[in-house]
From Swiss-Prot:
Annotated protein name in UniProt: Glutamyl-tRNA(Gln) amidotransferase subunit A
Domain of life: Bacteria
Transmembrane stretches, start-end: none
PANTHER family: GLUTAMYL-TRNA(GLN) AMIDOTRANSFERASE SUBUNIT A, TRANSAMIDASE
Gene Ontology process terms (BP): translation
UniProt GO molecular function: ATP binding; glutaminyl-tRNA synthase (glutamine-hydrolyzing) activity
Reactions catalysed, as given in the entry: L-glutamyl-tRNA(Gln) + L-glutamine + ATP + H2O = L-glutaminyl-tRNA(Gln) + L-glutamate + ADP + phosphate + H(+)
Catalytic activity, EC: 6.3.5.7
Keyword Repeat: no
Subunit structure, interactors included: Heterotrimer of A, B and C subunits.
Keyword Cell membrane in annotation: no
Amino acid sequence: MLHQLTLAEIARALADKQFSAEELTRTLLGRIRQLDPQLNSFISITDDLAIAQAKAADERRANGENGALLGAPIAHKDLFCTQGVRTSCGSKMLDNFVSPYDATVVEKLAAAGAVTLGKLNMDEFAMGSSNQSSHYGAVNNPWSLDRVPGGSSGGSAAAVAARLLPAATGTDTGGSIRQPAALTNLTGIKPTYGRVSRWGMIAYASSLDQGGPLARTAEDCALMLGVMAGFDPKDSTSVEQPVDDYLAALQKPLSGLRIGLPREYFGAGLDSRIADAVLAVVEELKTLGATVKDISLPNMQHAIPAYYVIAPAEASSNLSRFDGVRYGYRCDAPQNLEDLYKRSRAEGFGSEVKNRIMVGTYALSAGYYDAYYLQAQKIRRLIKNDFVSAFAEVDVILGPTTPNPAWKIGEKNDDPVSQYLEDIYTITANLAGLPGLSMPAGFVDGLPVGVQLLAPYFQEGRLLNVAHQYQQVSDWHTRTPAGF
C-alpha cells in the first residue's frame, strides 16, 4: 500500500521506477479527501499545485536526477508562507491571506522536489497544546478521534499518523513539534534555535520559534531536516554553521553514549505508566551500549511561568501588525481609525490569542516590566546554565515528552493551566535554544507515549542517531491507528 511507505522507502521505490510521483500524489490526495473529514487535519488541499510539482519531479527523475525528496509528498503547517496559497495561521485574521512568496523552508523543500499536498491545521497563531484554538475547528487524534492530537502542530501530527502523507513541517515554540509527535506516535525534531530559517514563518515568539519535521521515523526526519536546515541571510536569527550529514550520523553505534536522566522529570505529575515506558527505553539503550546517570536541572520548576511571560510578551509585539490596515481581517464600516483597530482585532483574533496578547502587554507595561519580563529572562539564563552544566557530564538528556497521554477534546478547556502543564518537559529546550526530539516509546490504554531526547547546540545528528538506533530494535513507530 503506497500510503504505508516512509519517505526513505518512497525514495527507493521512485528510484526503482515502481511507481511515479504523480501516481503516488494522486493516491494520497484521494486518501486525504476520503479520510480527512474524520480528522480535520488540513486547512487547504492544493491539488493543482501538487499534481504540477509531481509531474515536474517525474520529469527531473527522467532526466537523471535522483534526490531523496524528489517526488516525495509532504504538507506544511499553515504558518509557512506558500506563494499563491492561503496561509491562515489557523486564524480568522488571515482567513483570506494568500502569500505572495514562499518561506525559505517551503522554497528549500520545493527545490529538492518535494510535492506540497496542502496546508495543515494548527492552533491559532501557534498558541496552544491541543489544536482546539484553530478558527477551522479542532483536529482529532487518529488514535482516538475524541482526543486531541497535541499542538500547535496538531494537523501535521494527525495527518502523518493517519498515513495521509509520510512527513510534514511543523514549528516548535514550547513543544509544538515534540508534544504532538508524542501524542500521535511519531518522531519529531525541534532543531537548535537558528538552525532552520524562520523567514516566511509567521511569528508567535521570535526568540523561541523554530521549524522542523514530523515523520514516522528518525531516518525520515533526517531526510527532511537535511534539506530544511542551513544558513539564510534573509533571517537575522539564522546561524551560519555547516549542516551535518544527518543520514550518515544515523548509523553510529551507541557504545559509550552517556545518557542523563533528570530527577526533576520523574516527580509528581508524571503518569507512572509513562515513567515505566521511558525507563524501558533506557534499558534498551543500555543494551545498545549506552551508560546512564542521574542528573539535575534544578530550575526546571520555573520554566512554565517564565515561558508564559516571555512568549506572550513577544506575541503581543509580533501580533500588533495585524490591525486591519494592510492585510488580514478588516471589520465592516469602521467609524474611525481607533474603531478599525479595536474591532478588526477583537473580531479577527480568537480568545486564546487575545488572552496571550493581554498577558504579554501587561508583562511589558511600564510598572511591571522589571517584575515580570526581566525576571523571566533571568530564569531563562539559569535554565540555560543548568543545561550547560548537565552536558558537561552527559551527551544526551532523556525523559518523557509529556506527563500524560492525549486527553479528550474539551476536557481541559476550563483549566488552561493544566493544559499549559502538558508542556512542562518540552519548554526548557526552547528557553535554552537546544535541539530536542520526541520518538515513539509505547502505549498507555491504546494511546501513544513519547520519549524526549535533548542534546547540546547543533547536535541534531546525535538525537537522530539515538532515535534511529532505538528504532532498529523496537517497533512502536511502525504501529498504525485502526481505521487508517
